[in-house]
């Protein structure tokens, strides 16, 4: 083995050890591979379901103006969402797609096929925006936004 080959192998091994040592609170990469911080990716294809926040128990809700928030369960279609399998999450009442931006705002817009409207679902409850890599988050006031994954229950959501 020549010196260049040894240096290349050493550099790759060293780089790999730095990548493996990244803290779990680091911002998630916006790709479709499983991340130790996010868990295993699961199917985003589902019929009309509710999306419940693990910490607050409130349901993801929306309106025709595009506002997104959480409310206690009320049985309405504004609290129901569909996942047709293309990565979008659509409000059952309005037909609009869940959308976000790099500032962390979450809202709905008419579906346009863009990556800001694509979401990845993970086995431990994270819902990650494909474009920004940030995950859906909430609080007891009903606000909904995205932040880098931090392991908290406000960032975990369950369909039902």
UniProtKB/Swiss-Prot annotation:
Which parts are the sequence repeats? 47-84, 85-122, 123-160
Q: Which of UniProt's keywords are assigned here? A: Antiviral protein, Lectin, Repeat, Signal
Q: Does the keyword Repeat apply?
A: yes
Q: Where is this region: 3 X 38 AA tandem repeats?
A: 47-160
Domain of life, per the record?
Bacteria
Propeptide residue intervals? 27-46
- CDD domains named in the record: beta-trefoil_Ricin_AH (cd23415)
- The segment(s) forming the Ricin B-type lectin domain are 45-160
- The answer on whether this UniProt entry bears the keyword Cell wall biogenesis/degradation reads no
| Signal peptide bounds | 1-26
Q: Name one GO biological process term.
A: regulation of defense response to virus
The record's annotation in SMART domains points to: RICIN (SM00458)
Effect on the protein of changing residue 79 to A: Partial loss of HIV fusion inhibition
Q: Mind telling me which Gene3D superfamilies this protein's record contains?
A: 2.80.10.50
Which residues fall in a coiled-coil region? none
- Cite the PROSITE patterns for this sequence: RICIN_B_LECTIN
What are the recorded GO MF terms, alphabetically? carbohydrate binding
Q: How does it assemble?
A: Interacts with HIV gp120 and SIV gp130.
**Remaining remarks:** Anti-HIV protein that inhibits virus membrane fusion.
Protein name as annotated:
Actinohivin
Can you name the source organism? Actinomycete sp. (strain K97-0003)
């Amino acid at each position: 083995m020549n010196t260049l080959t040894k240096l290349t192998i050493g550099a790759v091994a060293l780089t790999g050890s730095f990548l493996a040592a990244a803290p779990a609170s680091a911002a998630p990469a916006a790709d479709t591979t499983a991340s130790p911080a996010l868990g295993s990716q699961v199917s985003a294809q589902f019929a009309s379901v509710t999306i419940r926040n693990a910490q607050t128990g409130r349901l993801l809700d929306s309106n025709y103006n595009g506002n997104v928030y959480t409310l206690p369960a009320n049985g309405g279609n504004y609290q129901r969402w569909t996942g047709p399998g293309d990565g979008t999450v659509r409000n059952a009442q309005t037909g609009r797609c869940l959308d976000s931006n790099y500032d962390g705002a979450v809202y709905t817009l008419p579906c346009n096929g863009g990556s800001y409207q694509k979401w990845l679902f993970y086995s431990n409850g994270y819902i990650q925006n494909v474009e920004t890599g940030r995950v859906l988050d909430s609080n007891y006031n009903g606000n909904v936004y995205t932040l880098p994954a931090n392991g908290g229950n406000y960032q975990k959501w369950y369909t039902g």
